[in-house]
A protein has these predicted regions:
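Surface-exposed, interaction-prone regions used to assemble/regulate multi-protein complexes
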Residues: 1-109
Length: 109
């Protein structure tokens, strides 16, 4: 099983977020499997094995989000044009219209 990183640009408002947590200094956002269909519609082919969910790491290209680990995500919500994540010791604000890199672990068959 090979793992490949695929980078693409998306608007956070279009993501169906199921949960948000952290791993090291990465912000991990669990998405609905519909993301697979959107990627394939945009021309990506690669034999996804999502097991119904897909783990995605978001990093903002213009804002350095440096999380302390471990971090306890309390809640998240959209406020105006921002995704606001309330955590145990800090508030993470991601502008929705900023360019976001999505790192997707895909299983090629």
């Amino acid at each position: 099983m090979n793992t490949k990183d695929f980078y693409s640009f998306y608007d956070l408002r279009e993501m169906d977020i199921l949960s948000i947590s952290s791993k090291g200094n990465d912000l991990i956002i669990l998405l609905n499997a519909d993301v697979e269909m959107e990627l394939m519609a945009n021309g990506f082919r690669g034999g996804f094995d999502l097991s119904f969910l897909q783990e995605v790491t978001f990093k903002d290209c213009r804002i350095n989000i440096n999380l302390t680990s471990p971090i306890d995500i309390k809640r998240y919500e959209y406020q105006d044009d921002k995704l606001v994540i309330q955590a145990n010791k800090e508030t993470i604000i991601i502008p929705e219209r900023e360019v976001v890199i999505k790192k997707i672990k895909t299983n090629h068959v």
